[in-house]
């Protein structure tokens, strides 16, 4: 029996990946587009991960944005943690934002994001 692989047309894995230390919890961060372009953050919803943006982020990157997303703690390639709370999620988001720059940047989210 052959295995059929179905891909979303236009989907593209990130151009760069890295990790941010959130007080001992490793947060996986993904970027599409030019590193010197204006940043735009994408926040995924609950029970999801940043890979959900593999179809949408490249379109934004092709439009001139540096698209940055991250796997929330306990999701995707980010570490699991002893603490899960809205406060922890917000601290993690702020650490990711600080790792990108200190200028105001748009954030797009869905569901919990």
Regions found by a protein language model. Name each.
Residues 109, 113:
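Gly/Ala-rich beta-loop-alpha elbow adjacent to hydrolase catalytic centers
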Residues 72-108:
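Active-site loop/oxyanion-hole signature of alpha/beta-hydrolase fold enzymes
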Residues 28-77:
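Conserved HGGG/HGGXW glycine-rich cap/lid loop of the alpha/beta-hydrolase fold
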């Amino acid at each position: 029996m052959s295995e059929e692989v179905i891909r979303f047309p236009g989907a593209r894995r990130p151009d760069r990946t890295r990790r941010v230390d959130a007080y001992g919890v490793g947060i996986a961060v993904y970027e599409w587009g030019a590193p010197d372009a204006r940043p735009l953050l994408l926040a995924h919803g609950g029970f999801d991960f940043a890979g959900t943006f593999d179809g949408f982020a490249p379109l934004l990157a092709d439009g001139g944005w540096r698209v940055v997303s991250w796997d929330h703690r306990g999701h995707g390639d980010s570490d699991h943690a002893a603490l899960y709370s809205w406060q922890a999620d917000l601290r993690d988001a702020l650490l990711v934002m600080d790792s990108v720059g200190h200028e105001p940047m748009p954030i797009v989210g869905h569901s919990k994001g």
